Each structure stands twice: as structure tokens, then as C-alpha cells.
């Protein structure tokens, strides 16, 4: 009998985790999902939505079976998260070296103007800080955000380190973009399954598979492949993000 199809939702603007080559979704996330759930006997349909919040809402409602996401108490209600993380992610402060930022603690950021993406969480402490001080400009896409940093319209960006570094490489003036070595927050990307999905009964199998992929080096290899492929494509296409 044909394999049962499961729906995986992605918003592919986070190389090397997920990105689009113009035809399909590429990167560590779709590769991992196809391998893992293929091995469990499923066919994977990739659903691309126009922003990250819509993926979260669709997973919560059971319209898609899974996403890759950070675990938060609010998300726990509707999503079952893998205990085994897919990847450690480090949110860094990016700045323009022509206007360096001096930051010892979170409070020091209040004196600078930041650029952030709608709908993103950057860790509870930082989110609270932003709510209190509010010295930020909100944008809907990273290209716009990093462009403002190059032109010194803003002083800093909070962004996942790997992704931000790849973005900066692509930009005219990007050689002036630097990241502070100290992470703002550290979080772990996990497989997040809708509690409405039959997959929610398979979390033990999912964890076992993730452990295997980590221990045999597969996750690191897929990540390295994605960085290489993205750089190669981005080098050939001006609009690649």
C-alpha cells in the first residue's frame, strides 16, 4: 500500500537550516525531515507558507503535522517537542564595525537602536527587555534588516549566528558587519509535532532517530553540505536568500 503522507511546514529564509533555491526548499531541516520520516515509512509533503507565524499556527491547529522550532511554554500546549535537539543555535548581536557597539550586559543595548523581525522570539529575557525599552525597528525580512545595518540606519541586529553570517557575506558592504562573540541567547532547534497528528504517538522513535543522526555525524554533514550549496547558489544569483 502507498506510504502515508505527512505535511511538514517551512518558511525557508534561514540558511543553512532552510532556504529556497527558487524551485524547492533546501537545507538541514528539509533534509533531516525527509530522511527521518522516510525511514519511519512516511512520504513527506513540504508546505511553504509566507511567514513563520503561519507555520506555527497551522501546526498548532493540526493542518500540518510538523515543523522545526524552539520549545516555549506557550507552544507546549499544541506541539510535542523532541527531547533530543536537532541543533544548538546561538543568537548573536550583529553590528557595523564603522559604528561599534559597547555592550557588557543586556541593559547596555537600551542606548542603541535595534532591528528585529516580526514574530520572532529571541529568548525570554531579551523579549522582555525589548517590551520595556522598545528602542527597535521591526521589519518583515532579513535582507531589509541587514541592509539597514550596512547603511548605519540601525546600530545592531539580533539574529541567529550562522544565518546572519551567511546573509552578511551576500551584501554589498557586508564586510563591515561583525558579530559580538558572546551569544545573546542559546536555544535548541527541535522537531515539533502537532498534538493533533498521529506522529505525536511516535516521539520515542523520533528521538531515537535524532540521536542516531547526531552520533553518526549526519546532522553535521547535512549542515556543512547546506552551507556549501547555499554559498555556491548565492554566488551565482544576486537575489538568493
Residue ranges and their predicted role:
Residues 11-13, 88-92, 171-207, 230-241:
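Periplasmic-binding protein-like
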Residues 2-78:
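Extracytoplasmic small-molecule ligand-binding "clamshell" domains
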Residues 27-39, 99, 107, 112, ...:
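Extended ligand-binding regions for polar small-molecule ligands
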Residues 53, 60, 69-78, 155-176, ...:
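A ligand-binding cleft/hinge motif common to bilobed small-molecule-binding domains
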Residues 45-57, 137-151:
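Short helix-initiation/N-cap motifs at beta->coil->alpha
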Residues 43, 121-137, 175, 210-241:
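Ligand-binding clefts/hinges and TM-proximal coupling segments of bilobed small-molecule sensing domains
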Residues 12-15, 26-35, 96-132, 137, ...:
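Bilobed "Venus flytrap"/periplasmic-binding protein-like clamshell domains
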Residues 6-12, 82-104, 118, 191-194:
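Hydrophobic/proline-rich hinge and linker segments of small-molecule sensing/allosteric domains
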Amino acid at each position: 500500500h502507498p506510504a502515508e503522507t505527512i505535511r511538514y511546514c517551512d518558511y525557508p529564509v534561514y540558511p543553512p537550516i532552510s532556504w529556497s533555491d527558487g524551485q524547492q526548499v533546501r537545507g538541514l531541516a528539509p533534509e533531516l525531515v525527509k530522511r527521518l520520516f522516510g525511514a519511519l515509512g512516511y512520504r513527506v509533503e513540504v508546505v511553504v507558507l509566507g511567514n513563520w507565524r503561519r507555520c506555527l499556527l497551522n501546526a498548532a491547529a493540526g493542518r500540518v503535522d510538523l515543523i522545526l522550532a524552539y520549545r516555549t511554554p506557550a507552544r507546549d500546549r499544541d506541539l510535542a517537542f523532541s527531547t533530543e535537539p536537532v541543533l544548538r543555535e546561538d543568537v548573536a548581536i550583529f553590528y557595523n564595525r564603522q559604528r561599534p557597539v559597547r555592550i557588557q550586559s543586556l541593559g547596555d543595548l537600551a542606548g542603541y537602536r535595534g532591528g528585529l523581525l516580526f514574530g520572532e522570539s529571541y529568548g525570554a529575557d531579551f523579549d522582555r527587555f525589548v517590551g520595556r525599552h522598545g528602542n527597535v525597528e521591526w521589519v518583515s525580512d532579513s535582507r531589509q534588516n541587514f541592509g539597514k545595518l550596512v547603511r548605519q540606519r540601525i546600530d545592531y541586529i539580533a539574529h541567529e549566528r550562522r544565518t546572519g553570517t551567511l546573509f552578511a557575506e551576500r551584501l554589498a558592504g557586508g564586510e563591515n558587519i561583525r558579530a559580538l562573540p558572546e551569544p545573546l541567547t542559546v536555544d535548541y532547534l527541535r522537531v515539533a509535532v502537532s498534538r493533533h497528528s498521529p506522529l505525536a504517538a511516535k516521539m520515542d522513535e523520533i528521538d531515537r532517530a535524532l540521536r542516531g543522526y547526531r552520533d553518526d555525524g549526519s546532522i553535521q554533514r547535512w549542515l556543512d553540505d547546506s552551507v556549501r550549496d547555499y554559498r555556491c547558489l548565492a554566488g551565482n544569483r544576486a537575489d538568493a536568500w
